[in-house]
Amino acid sequence: MSETSRTAFGGRRAVPPNNSNAAEDDLPTVELQGVVPRGVNLQEFLNVTSVHLFKERWDTNKVDHHTDKYENNKLIVRRGQSFYVQIDFSRPYDPRRDLFRVEYVIGRYPQENKGTYIPVPIVSELQSGKWGAKIVMREDRSVRLSIQSSPKCIVGKFRMYVAVWTPYGVLRTSRNPETDTYILFNPWCEDDAVYLDNEKEREEYVLNDIGVIFYGEVNDIKTRSWSYGQFEDGILDTCLYVMDRAQMDLSGRGNPIKVSRVGSAMVNAKDDEGVLVGSWDNIYAYGVPPSAWTGSVDILLEYRSSENPVRYGQCWVFAGVFNTFLRCLGIPARIVTNYFSAHDNDANLQMDIFLEEDGNVNSKLTKDSVWNYHCWNEAWMTRPDLPVGFGGWQAVDSTPQENSDGMYRCGPASVQAIKHGHVCFQFDAPFVFAEVNSDLIYITAKKDGTHVVENVDATHIGKLIVTKQIGGDGMMDITDTYKFQEGQEEERLALETALMYGAKKPLNTEGVMKSRSNVDMDFEVENAVLGKDFKLSITFRNNSHNRYTITAYLSANITFYTGVPKAEFKKETFDVTLEPLSFKKEAVLIQAGEYMGQLLEQASLHFFVTARINETRDVLAKQKSTVLTIPEIIIKVRGTQVVGSDMTVTVEFTNPLKETLRNVWVHLDGPGVTRPMKKMFREIRPNSTVQWEEVCRPWVSGHRKLIASMSSDSLRHVYGELDVQIQRRPSM
């Protein structure tokens, strides 16, 4: 095999990096061995006239390989599984004197030992785990082959050639884009590293192109649908382009560990011009607010066409795009949400909340933040680089939080290893362990410089970890896959193991932790609706025979969902007298006018209550967050819901606020029903309703979902969705 271009290697034989699927080197159509005698016509030997790949959606190849949903007219197969190719020759094939083989090539500088040049021999029987081609039909001038790929081969877009051997050299077909073949990971193949043995799980984690993302607050969980769109036109090529932009060597693209790690770095643009720019400051000039996106398709296609990072994303957007990337390539993946997620820069398993001596929060000393929720991904794969038992779900996170080996990425970290405290195993397990296992420490910073630990809350962080249930839109609690229940012996052993294997010990604090107080405090927040007043109820319970007086402080803040406060909108001090063995409730009215002018896009409020028992100097502290209920978009359809037939979709929104909404963008998406689209309204006045109608022509049958979002200068995170059942086109 010869190269079409020669490269100067500076006195050292080396092959340049092969890190672009899009780059090509053509193989020569003729490779002669010696001099061809005069009068010999090479065209008299067996010649290929055409190649058929059976690549239509309804053909066996795509149906058997579960790739019939891809909007791509090329052949798409999954590795480790046989597929059919038919070759037409210039004359009938005679196995006694004719010799040919199929060749697959990817990238430039193809090498057999790197897996970038694959000669596929004709064999009598296919062998599991090996490339091979078996003749399953000979008819006239045609030969049909059953070709089996290796379950470890590179994932990407291959160029296909047919080579015929003659006494004088090799005759090879010309480069033909129509025979290009995509090879993907195969969760249906037992020998593939991403093999998943449950069909319902494969349908959910590989083939489902619509998901549900959980957000909000642990006591007020909210949901939104997300269009992954992994089968949409152009998405597969974009996912390969993402790896090209990372300059990932092609020889590593068959390893799901490497692919998922590269993906976690490339979905964010922090240090590598990746897909999405993150922004958490509520300012989204020259971009789209994170809450406005309805799915991954627009984001990925814009990244591919502009070749520049797309603005803007936050954790659930990064997770949604990353899920598309993984599922598109064939790696089973899901989005998980961790409620009360610790962002622990030191991974020391401790989140410190510093208090003044009077009980107020010391914002200068308090640096750690607890996110109301954080979304990341899990990808399913074996981990041959780890001891037995640590395969399966791996945590991977593309939200740029911490630097890992010089880049902003996280994982894959074995969820099983995290649960048992084996944080020594790569990649980034200590960080994920801290996200779900840190303690919340309340510390009084005394004026003399000493610190006193007032309270330790070991159950606040990682309160609930959830994902979408299989086959439905409900919530599945997976907390016990990450951690043992608090207080169990296994939980203590996991923590000791994590400390032994490298997690940092909690910082030492001066003084001795105080004994449990005789007074308990808790508070509840009423269901809070955007633009309405609501109440907060604080309950004090005296468990002793003593009489106590209490001075309590309430701090109400507008916060980012990451737990970082933007502004304090209410501060209140009150005194409470508790008789022996009694309880008392204090109600605080939160008025809409106090918070409306400063709200951030997720309408998240955080309440911090501290109380000092004057007689004992004990400090009680509790904090809770709430997400205001935001009005929804209404979606309606009329007309026949049939593949290929027009149906009208109406998007409707009524402004319930007392102020005019300006610069309103409405987004509509629905994989298989409509391409992503958007419409702008200059303003929506109070109590006014706007409507937007579009005619759609579905191209995918079955259960589908329409998803809409609305964003404006002063109101965001407005969603709506509608389930539709698209019928097949009636046969004639």
From Swiss-Prot:
Residues annotated as glycosylated: 614
Outcome of swapping residue 168 to C: In FA13AD; decreased intracellular protein abundance; decreased protein-glutamine gamma-glutamyltransferase activity; no effect on alpha-2-antiplasmin to fibrin cross-linking activity; loss of fibrin alpha chain cross-linking activity; decreased clot fiber thickness
Glycoprotein found in the keyword field: yes
Top EC class, one word: transferase
Reactions mediated catalytically: L-glutaminyl-[protein] + L-lysyl-[protein] = [protein]-L-lysyl-N(6)-5-L-glutamyl-[protein] + NH4(+)
Keyword Membrane: no
Single GO cellular component term: platelet alpha granule lumen
E.C. number(s) listed in UniProt: 2.3.2.13
Outcome recorded upon mutating residue 565 to L: In allele F13A*1A, allele F13A*2A and allele F13*(2)A
Annotated coiled-coil segments of the chain: none
Record-listed Ca(2+) binding positions: 437, 439, 486, 491
Residues at the active site: 315, 374, 397
Cofactor: how and how many bound: Binds 1 Ca(2+) ion per subunit.
Subunit structure: Tetramer of two A chains (F13A1) and two B (F13B) chains.
Function: Factor XIII is activated by thrombin and calcium ion to a transglutaminase that catalyzes the formation of gamma-glutamyl-epsilon-lysine cross-links between fibrin chains, thus stabilizing the fibrin clot. Also cross-link alpha-2-plasmin inhibitor, or fibronectin, to the alpha chains of fibrin.
Family: Belongs to the transglutaminase superfamily. Transglutaminase family.
Protein name: Coagulation factor XIII A chain
